[in-house]
């Protein structure tokens, strides 16, 4: 697969040959969905908590005598059916993380990249550098390229000026190649890869 390379100013900078093993697969929604669910499960806080009957601060004395009152045979005021009692089967602090094999995660990333390429939502930039860290100037460049909702992936090191200028632009994410992931690729309309990012991806999946 061949895509044209453009500069931040919108000028033509040649073309690049993309590996069909990474960008030319037929996207499988089931694999992508498994990876997205794995990511969302992993980042869920799991700090929810409700007190059970053993954790309620209340006397453990029997409420009233067993027989002769005509009432039910209650033994404790901490039980769930009373106001102020403990919660039955309430949420506890736990991890929501699930397991997903590394090979499935890698395959899901390839399918997400292939999906963007197939839909025509993949843009290749020569580089992501900016001389002056000015957000207004960067917005102008992106408007010229038609990028209003995008994820930009650069090489191992982000350019400080570019990252600083992009930080305050809504619907725009900038990540180094180490941070590329399926969920962030799918949540943005366009995927922008620099030539350094493409080289890193091909080296990773070699």
UniProtKB/Swiss-Prot annotation:
Entry-linked Pfam families: Ribosomal_L4 (PF00573)
Cited Gene3D superfamilies: 3.40.1370.10
Transmembrane stretches, start-end: none
GO molecular function annotation: rRNA binding; structural constituent of ribosome
GO cellular component, one term: ribonucleoprotein complex
GO biological process, one term: translation
InterPro entries xref list: Ribosomal_uL4, Ribosomal_uL4-like, Ribosomal_uL4_dom_sf
Keyword tags: Ribonucleoprotein, Ribosomal protein, RNA-binding, rRNA-binding
Subunit annotation: Part of the 50S ribosomal subunit.
HAMAP family found in the cross-reference section: Ribosomal_uL4_B
Job of this protein: One of the primary rRNA binding proteins, this protein initially binds near the 5'-end of the 23S rRNA. It is important during the early stages of 50S assembly. It makes multiple contacts with different domains of the 23S rRNA in the assembled 50S subunit and ribosome. Forms part of the polypeptide exit tunnel.
NCBIfam families, per database record: rplD_bact
Protein family (similarity comment): Belongs to the universal ribosomal protein uL4 family.
Protein name: Large ribosomal subunit protein uL4
Source species of the chain: Bradyrhizobium sp. (strain BTAi1 / ATCC BAA-1182)
């Amino acid at each position: 697969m061949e895509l044209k390379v453009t500069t931040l100013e919108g000028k033509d900078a040649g073309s690049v040959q993309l590996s069909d093993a990474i960008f030319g697969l037929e996207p499988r929604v089931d694999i992508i969905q498994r990876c997205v669910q794995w990511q969302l499960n992993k980042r869920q806080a799991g700090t929810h908590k409700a007190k059970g009957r053993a954790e309620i601060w209340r006397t453990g004395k029997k409420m009233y005598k067993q027989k002769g009152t005509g009432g039910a045979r209650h033994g404790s005021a901490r039980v769930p059916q009373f106001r102020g009692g403990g919660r039955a089967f309430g949420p506890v602090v736990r991890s929501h993380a699930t397991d997903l094999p590394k090979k499935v995660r890698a395959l899901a990333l390839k399918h997400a990249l292939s999906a963007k390429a197939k839909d025509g939502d993949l843009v290749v930039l020569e580089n992501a550098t900016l001389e002056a860290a000015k957000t207004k100037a960067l917005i102008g460049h992106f408007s010229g390229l038609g990028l209003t909702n995008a994820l930009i992936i650069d090489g191992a090191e982000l350019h400080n000026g570019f990252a600083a200028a992009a930080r305050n632009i809504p619907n725009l994410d900038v990540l180094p190649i180490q941070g590329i992931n399926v969920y962030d690729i799918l949540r943005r309309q366009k995927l922008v890869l620099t030539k350094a990012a493409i080289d890193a991806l091909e080296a990773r999946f070699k």
